[in-house]
Curated annotation (Swiss-Prot):
The keyword NADP is assigned to this record: no
Name the record gives this protein: Large ribosomal subunit protein uL1
Gene Ontology annotations of biological process type: regulation of translation; translation
GO molecular function, one term: rRNA binding
Function: Binds directly to 23S rRNA. The L1 stalk is quite mobile in the ribosome, and is involved in E site tRNA release.
A Pfam family annotated for this UniProt entry: Ribosomal_L1
Gene3D superfamilies, per the entry: 3.30.190.20, 3.40.50.790
Keywords of the record: Repressor, Ribonucleoprotein, Ribosomal protein, RNA-binding, rRNA-binding, Translation regulation, tRNA-binding
Subunit field text: Part of the 50S ribosomal subunit.
């Protein structure tokens, strides 16, 4: 443990906790400090000017990151007929209807994303207690309940991330891996922030992008100067 502590101490010394860094500088610092023995994820935390206790100020949605997430995902689709065939053609690993529901009830959850056609929700709705706590419940707000299941599968495979404000009004999301080029991380950063800005609730008043920080799994975090977000 002491070795890890010393490593973190040295890493933290490279960042001024009181300084706001330009986006590119923050990404470069965090990327350079991601020195663990695995490909660390690069994450973003955005504190939004919303009151998450009010339903009309909950920010939720999804965005396809232009450079992907660096993670391969297994997709399950609840659909039948032509939709089921389209989902398979788009690359879904698991496709089914009542049979897939039985698999889920039996505890077979070998997938990362669940997509459903609207007519399948009568089946999927019964699985809420299983899928919900795992963050797998399909929802139209994030594009996982849709008549175009093939497009949803392609988006999931292409690097779509879902976001939702937590109880403190903060969005947490991954924008890539430490192995990504800085330019790719910046593109993903911009895509996510742009999506959040477009999703701003009408009821949100005052400063919307209050604080932004970039960090890695085992490394440091750097605060971002929001004035440089669109620079």
């Amino acid at each position: 443990m002491a070795k890890i502590s010393k490593r973190l101490q040295n890493l933290k010394a490279t960042v001024d906790r009181n300084k706001l860094y330009a986006v590119d500088e923050a990404i470069a610092l965090v990327k350079a400090a991601a020195t663990a023995k695995f490909d660390e994820s690069i994450d973003i935390a955005v504190n939004l000017g919303v009151d998450p206790r009010k339903s009309d100020q909950v920010v939720r949605g999804s965005v396809v990151l232009p450079r992907g997430t660096g993670k391969s995902v297994r997709v399950a689709v609840f659909a039948q007929g032509a939709n089921a065939e389209a989902a398979k053609a788009a690359g879904a690993e698991v496709v089914g209807f009542d049979d897939l529901a039985e698999q889920v009830k039996a505890g077979n959850l070998d997938f990362d994303v669940v997509i459903a056609s609207p007519d399948a929700m009568r089946v999927v709705g019964q699985l809420g207690q299983i899928l919900g706590p795992r963050g797998l419940m399909p929802n139209p707000k994030v594009g996982t309940v849709t008549p175009n299941v093939a497009e949803a599968v392609k988006n999931a495979k292409a690097g779509q991330v879902q976001y939702r404000t937590d109880k403190a009004g903060i969005i947490h999301a991954t924008i890539g891996r430490a192995s990504f080029e800085a330019e790719a991380l910046r593109e993903n950063f911009s895509a996510l922030v742009d999506a959040l800005v477009k999703a701003k609730p009408a009821a949100s008043k005052g400063v919307y992008l209050k604080k932004i920080a970039v960090s890695s799994t085992m490394g440091i975090g750097a605060r971002v100067d929001t004035a440089t977000v669109n620079a």
